[in-house]
Regions:
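Extreme N-terminal, non-catalytic leader segments
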Residues: 1-31
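P-loop (Walker A) phosphate-binding loop of NTP-binding proteins
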Residues: 38
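Walker A/P-loop
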Residues: 44
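A glycine- and Lys/Arg-enriched "phosphate-lid" helix/loop adjacent to the NTP-binding pocket
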Residues: 131-172
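ATP-dependent small-molecule kinase phosphotransfer cores
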Residues: 3, 61-127, 143, 155-156, ...
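Hydrophobic anchor at the beta1->P-loop junction of P-loop NTPases
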Residues: 35
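ATP-binding Walker
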Residues: 41
Length: 172
């Protein structure tokens, strides 16, 4: 798998030549549920529900992205723009995601990680020896994503207007 080799090279180039061995050393047998999908598909909500149900630890790659931006003293939007020219940010977040997937930093018996691409990092960690991974991919219609956006970002009134006025069309 070419992308596995690409991830390994990026980690060695940006994190350090011993970064892969450090990840291997952190791997535990703790099961991890990796939830991926598009924006506004319910990843965070369901990941939190699963973590609560199994009395596990919840991680959000989006929160990690926000923490990295705050640490750099920039907004999330500014950091997102930097991703176009600065590969190191993405690699740092991917590496931290792999550290989460290792299971080393959780006190509970299971972890739940949600984000746009944790399954890719899970495949990489599996190549390094991590086992007990479950991958779930969330999708929903464009209409549902738009309605979720209205509710989350604008409020219930906008959501109700959207519900009444946005046509239910299959765009696939």
């Amino acid at each position: 798998m070419e992308y596995i080799a690409g991830i390994e090279k990026a980690f060695k180039d940006y994190i350090g030549s011993d970064s892969i061995n450090k990840l291997r050393e952190k791997i535990t047998d703790k099961p991890m549920i990796l939830i991926a999908g598009d924006q506004l598909t319910g990843k965070s909500t369901q990941a939190k529900n699963l973590a609560e149900y199994y009395r596990g630890t919840f991680y959000s790659v989006g929160n990690l992205f926000r923490e990295v931006a705050a640490k750099r003293g920039i907004t999330v939007a500014e950091q997102a723009k930097l991703l176009l020219t600065e590969r190191g940010i993405d690699v740092e977040i991917d590496y931290k995601t792999c550290e989460m997937i290792s299971g080393n930093s959780i006190d509970t018996n299971i972890g739940v990680i949600e984000g746009r691409q944790p399954a890719y990092m899970g495949s990489f960690m599996q190549e390094l020896g991590k086992r007990n991974l479950v991958r779930i991919y969330f999708q929903c219609s464009i209409r549902e994503q738009a309605l979720r956006f209205l509710r989350r970002e604008i409020g219930e009134v906008a959501y109700q207007k959207g519900l009444a006025n946005v046509p239910d069309i299959d765009y696939s």
